[in-house]
Amino acid sequence: MPNLKAIRDRIKTIKDTRKITEAMRLVAAAKVRRAQEQVMASRPFADRLAQVLYGLQTRLRFEDANLPLLAKRPVKTVALLVVTGDRGLCGGYNTNVIRRAKERTEELEAEGIKYTLVIVGRKAAQYFQRRDYPIDAVYSGLEQIPSASEAGQIANELLSLFLSETVDRVELIYTKFVSLISSKPVVQTLLPLDPQGLEAADDEIFRLTTRASHLEVNREKVTSNLPALPPDMIFEQDPVQILDALLPLYLSNQLLRALQEAAASELAARMTAMNNASDNAQTLIGTLTLSYNKARQAAITQEILEVVAGAEALR
């Protein structure tokens, strides 16, 4: 016969665990909203910066401008910026990014191209350091919602590698925020910058909304109308110098948005994982409660039978 106290203790333990997973789910949901608000808050600056860069690039289209960040050269070495989280309990979020990064290193090796890793997040650092991958820098302990200063610090490291010609291309591997139950690791080229990319093609903004007591994500396509600068605009400095100064800022801004989206993906994955854990705990509590009631009923029945048997024996 099952031990009633053991079942009762197990039910209590699972209920306590469910309280923790439910609290973590609610915290993750609140932080996803904060990540969304950060993206929305930086949107006007990003749009204006893209407008100025596009206008300058259009103005200089027929000039022989020397812009190192736009210069393409034969690729011998690639820097891979791999973005994961510092913590677990987020489903397959970290594993999927690490797997995609490993696949990319194998693709580069097959092409005879060297690579080095710049890692954001403790999980990826632990994985690749343990396996002796070439690592240039590791950034961990970042704020859960990345800040502009953190993105700028990472961007400066990437700029240093690219401008010193230590690497010929910089690629970003991060998780694109698709929905609360879906995320997709993607590979994106950061350097050299593509002038055509200044038109914000395929750009999207995500919004976390509530419908019928459930959280869902709406994605909104961004269509940027980037007019050319007025032809009679007079620059106090050389337009080439202005563009050369703004391109690092544009890179930092693009990196910040990618880090924010990766953070939102991690939080959404954690929210989903904790929601599943809470549901599983509730199911297990129901099963154990049923087992407890059956065992208790069997114990009561057994006691009644023993009392009846004892009474019969005394006759």
UniProtKB/Swiss-Prot annotation:
Protein keywords: ATP synthesis, CF(1), Hydrogen ion transport, Ion transport, Membrane, Thylakoid, Transport
Keyword Iron present in the record's keywords: the answer is no
Q: Principal place where this protein is found?
A: membrane
Cell compartments where the protein resides: Cellular thylakoid membrane
GO: which molecular function terms?
Answer: ATP binding; proton-transporting ATP synthase activity, rotational mechanism
What is the protein's membrane topology class? Peripheral membrane protein
GO cellular component terms, alphabetically, are: plasma membrane-derived thylakoid membrane; proton-transporting ATP synthase complex
| Keyword Nuclease on entry | no
User: Can you tell me which family this protein belongs to?
Assistant: Belongs to the ATPase gamma chain family.
Quaternary structure and interacting proteins, as annotated: F-type ATPases have 2 components, CF(1) - the catalytic core - and CF(0) - the membrane proton channel. CF(1) has five subunits: alpha(3), beta(3), gamma(1), delta(1), epsilon(1). CF(0) has three main subunits: a, b and c.
What does this gene product do? Produces ATP from ADP in the presence of a proton gradient across the membrane. The gamma chain is believed to be important in regulating ATPase activity and the flow of protons through the CF(0) complex.
- This chain's protein is named ATP synthase gamma chain
Q: Which species is listed as the source?
A: Synechococcus sp. (strain PCC 6716)
